[in-house]
């Protein structure tokens, strides 16, 4: 009788949960101050007007308004928040 006693355990078989990164508020959406606009690793997108950046590179609204994405120098992408007073003009 062939027996298989002690098989070694696999070195694989584990994974970490996804980090839920990405755009949380898209262009044209209304935001209030403090709303997270983008969660990212590194500065894929840079903060524009009325947008702050956290220590983990999260971009968030500093004022109430409407989200706008645009590109700038060196091919960088920027996100700004246009206040509702600016949008009305």
Curated annotation (Swiss-Prot):
Transmembrane segments: none annotated. SUPFAM superfamilies: Ribosomal L27 protein-like. One of its GO terms (molecular function) is structural constituent of ribosome. Coiled coil: none annotated. Residues 1-20 are annotated as: Disordered. GO terms for biological process: translation. Belongs to the bacterial ribosomal protein bL27 family. This is Large ribosomal subunit protein bL27. It comes from Rhizorhabdus wittichii (strain DSM 6014 / CCUG 31198 / JCM 15750 / NBRC 105917 / EY 4224 / RW1) (Sphingomonas wittichii). The gene is rpmA.
């Amino acid at each position: 009788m062939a027996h298989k006693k002690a098989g070694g355990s696999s070195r694989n078989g584990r994974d970490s949960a996804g980090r839920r990164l990405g755009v949380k508020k898209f262009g044209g959406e209304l935001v209030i101050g403090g709303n997270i606009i983008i969660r990212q690793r590194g500065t894929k997108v840079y903060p524009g007007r009325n947008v702050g950046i956290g220590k983990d590179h999260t971009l968030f609204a500093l004022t109430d308004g409407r989200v706008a994405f645009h590109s700038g120098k060196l091919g960088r992408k920027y996100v700004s928040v246009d206040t509702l007073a600016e949008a009305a003009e």
